[in-house]
Amino acid sequence: MLNHKSTRSARLFWLGALLGAAVFLLVYGLAPLDVANDAFCRGGYIEKDIQQHYAGWLFYRQSSAGWPLCIARGINYPDGLSVAYTDSIPLVAALLKPVANLVGGTFQYMGWFTLVCFALQGGFGALLAGLFLPGCAAPLAADLLFV
């Protein structure tokens, strides 16, 4: 049986993660979660950095597989450039490249990655606030400062 402290922590984490996901949906809506919709990547949303991230992903996706991993061969030809330098989240890019090739057409993961970031920030923010505030409502209210 779980003790009260671990049950409270789990509850705070999941409620904070839901709060983070809700904030994501309020800020960006559902459009970024459509992997076939890259309009928000090309047009930039709030900030313009995502255009660089998406361009790096597009170059990497079109590159042939080889060693070292995560090299976009179309940039800095003929040597290529690591997608880490384009901030295209190399681990996610490497894992999703085979999926993107199977799906074909437009494929972006930036929206889902951002949703996961919001949820994790909300969850861990609630846990951090829970260290200093009693109950469940007060840490979740403080969690709004994190997401």
Language-model features: where?
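Start-transfer (signal-anchor) and selected internal transmembrane alpha helices
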Residues: 1-36
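Short linear motifs in intrinsically disordered/low-complexity regions
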Residues: 4-5, 80, 88, 144
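Membrane-water interface of alpha-helical transmembrane segments
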Residues: 7-10, 14, 107, 111-114, ...
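Hydrophobic alpha-helical transmembrane segments
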Residues: 14-18, 112, 140-144
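Membrane-interface coil-to-helix junctions
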Residues: 24-121
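Membrane-embedded helix bundles of polyisoprenyl
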Residues: 115-147
